[in-house]
Amino acid sequence: MHDLTRRSRERTDEILVDHAAEYGPFRVRELEWEPDAAAYDRLRERFDADAAGGAGIWLTRDDAVLCVRHEDEDAWSGPGGKREAGETFAETAERETREEAGVEGTIEGVIEVHAVSYVTSDHPSLVLPTVMFDGRYAGGEPEPNADDRVAEVRWFTERPDPLRYDALASFPMPTGNL
């Protein structure tokens, strides 16, 4: 195993252990993506700067979940994005929710973590985590942020369709709406 692959896997495993200790058990999905060379280089730079991975919140209020739709896309997801250097995954999720949707959320747990292996034929695999938190609405008016390429923010009482990521199909809907 290449040193970079080993180090990124070990760091991801540490994050899994730390989040399980803080939030309790959650699902882990092992995923594999094939980025182009430029995207891989950006991911590698973020890993080297301790800013690798990302986070989001599946934010609920009463009987609804908050989702965003990005420009040039028709699919929906919870707000979330890339982690910044020195930021915890929870801080990333809360910041991205404010930036993308204009609302505040309170994290209540972890739904799942995606351990994503970025694989190319020219570089060693890089394993990075994306933490998906469960959260409750804490305030603010939903407002799309064009600076983050968010075209629309909306509360859904039924699972939105289409979903940006297949994994969202298993996320809990408030009051049991599946």
Positions of predicted regions on the chain:
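Acidic, metal-coordinating catalytic segment for phosphate/diphosphate chemistry
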Residues: 6-56
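Conserved Nudix-box catalytic region and its N-terminal flanking loop in Nudix hydrolases
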Residues: 60-99
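A carboxyl-terminal module marker
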Residues: 1-4, 178
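NUDIX/MutT-family hydrolases
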Residues: 144-175
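Active-site-adjacent beta-strand/loop module that shapes the phosphate/pyrophosphate-binding cleft
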Residues: 115-142
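Short, well-ordered beta-strand micro-motif
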Residues: 59, 132-136, 154-157
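A short coil-to-beta-strand element that immediately follows conserved catalytic motifs
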Residues: 104-113
